[in-house]
Amino acid sequence: IALLPCNLASVLYNKTQGAVQVAAINTLSVLYVVESGDTVHSIQDLAGKTVYSTGKGTTPEFAFNYILSQNGIDPQKDITIEYKSESTEIAAMLQNAEVTIAVLPQPYVTTVKMQNDKVRTALSFNEEWDKLGTDSSMVTGVVLVRKAFAEENPLAFNEFLDEYKASTEYVNANTEEAAEWIAEYGIVAKAPVAVKALPESSIVYI
């Protein structure tokens, strides 16, 4: 059993010739357009601008390009997207006001906003995706399992799924207590960041 980004799950599905399957969706989009200014209020406002992002060749790039294209913006011609290797790099640039517009995931969005009050959340990928009227939500993370394992251990696997669902519900309902655990185990550096980031992190069990 593994908790993985959806694009990696699809790669493993193909590499194993279908030996793995998605058991649940655990994360919708955690991506946001943020800016140190007040110029972006719609996707159309990004035309002609430079936006910094991470995840070239992965979900952030594919999702961003799709949203742009569906809004009449050519990702190759109408906007300049500068890709960086790490979200921490973009976060540091935003904190120092070197960048005005960027695509960042949670909890980096919360961290940056807490350290620089000039940075604001301009757009949510979840909201922009839903505006397109597709039949599905934007998915970021999934629970992946080997089919053979699930078939050979149905009781244990179903127990895991039940406990995982309960854990998801608990975290969403008890953000302050969950934030303390998240900080203690080093998932996010500080509990106050986790408290603010959790409601924006699209943690689900579907």
What are these regions (language model features)?
Residues 75-76, 129-136, 190-194:
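Short helix-coil transition/hinge motifs at the ends and kinks of transmembrane helices
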Residues 1-76, 80-83, 100-106, 122-123:
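Short, glycine-/small- and polar/acidic-enriched structural segments
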Residues 7-8, 82, 86-180:
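Pocket-lining segment of extracytoplasmic ligand-binding domains
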Residues 73, 117-119, 187:
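Short aromatic/hydrophobic-glycine micro-motifs
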Residues 45-49, 142, 202-205:
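Flexible glycine/proline-enriched surface loops and loop-helix/loop-strand junctions
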Residues 32-34, 131-134, 206:
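Short, solvent-exposed polar/charged micro-motifs at secondary-structure junctions
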Residues 113-114, 176-206:
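An extracytoplasmic/periplasmic, membrane-proximal ligand-sensing/linker region
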